[in-house]
Amino acid sequence: VRGKKVRAIADKIKENREELAKLETLDTGKTLEESYADMYDIHNVFMYFAGLADKDGGEIINTPIPNSESKVIKEPIGVVTQITPWNYPLLQASWKIAPALATGCSLVMKPSEITPLTTIRVFELMEEVGFPKGTINLILGAGSEVGDVMSGH
């Protein structure tokens, strides 16, 4: 189920890439061409982690101890807090959002106060996908106020 939801976000990003690229350009001042290229990278990040979400059954690791085995199991750790910088705002956010959701974690995201537009829009798209209430949480505000509270909690 997690993989399908994360894949659905990737699809929404692809469907809305022109709008997202324009917002990214408005936010950052980079060229529309560069912002448009970023949307392909962002789509691919979500697709990559969507694929991993379906493969979390565990992995056996060889050990030097006879008659023993070591198994790595990927489990949600709970709530992930994420603060992203102003440069490459949506790309850096995707590096945090996609793995958190793919592993079943809830997230609290605070984008840079000077470049929040694409992150706000992607959160709207994630709501359209239908993540359970409280799974995705967006906090806006100055880093000196909101970021300090989040990182000090």
Region spans (language model):
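Rossmann-like NAD(P) dinucleotide-binding subdomain of oxidoreductase/dehydrogenase enzymes
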Residues: 48, 58-153
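Glycine-rich loop-to-alpha-helix module at the N-terminal edge of alpha/beta enzyme cores
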Residues: 1-56, 67
